[in-house]
Amino acid sequence: MPQGKNSQSVGRIGELSVELELTGRNWLVGNFNSNIQNAAVYDLFAVKKNIKRLLRVKSYSLWNNDFGTIQYTAKKNGEIFLDLDEKNKDDFVILCGVREGKVKEYFIIPTQIVSKELKKSNKIYHQGKKRDGTKRKITSHRALFLQESKDHYWCGWRRKWNKYHNNWKLLEN
């Protein structure tokens, strides 16, 4: 990533790229953040024919060998996503892997799936111990690693989520 890129610019690149990608696929796209600075729940909404989608865009930096980490901060109640309703099938996360100022990969995933996997990964992580045998400290940090690494549940998500990789058609189902 070029020097000077910060998490805000990586996030903005992802958001703009999703807007452009959807517009090119004949979706009408609106940005909640254009009216509400850094909207708390959704970033974008998209409409195509009779289909509507509420989108939470999450960008992450891609490093050497496409290493990338999807990171969230859980709320005090343990939830990652505000206003997540299991009955709402219109709620999606679009993950954007950014390298050198451009999105190189997208994952289009129902928000409930991302929430479930982040919680499960965090639970499994805390069942293990640190190298010195002591318990791992419980924090609000949640992470999934895209790259393969050892045999940890929280690694290898590019492979595990392959069916969501650049699969924009999921928004139309």
Regions from the PLM with identified roles:
Residues 1-40, 45-173:
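Mixed-charge (Asp/Glu-Lys/Arg
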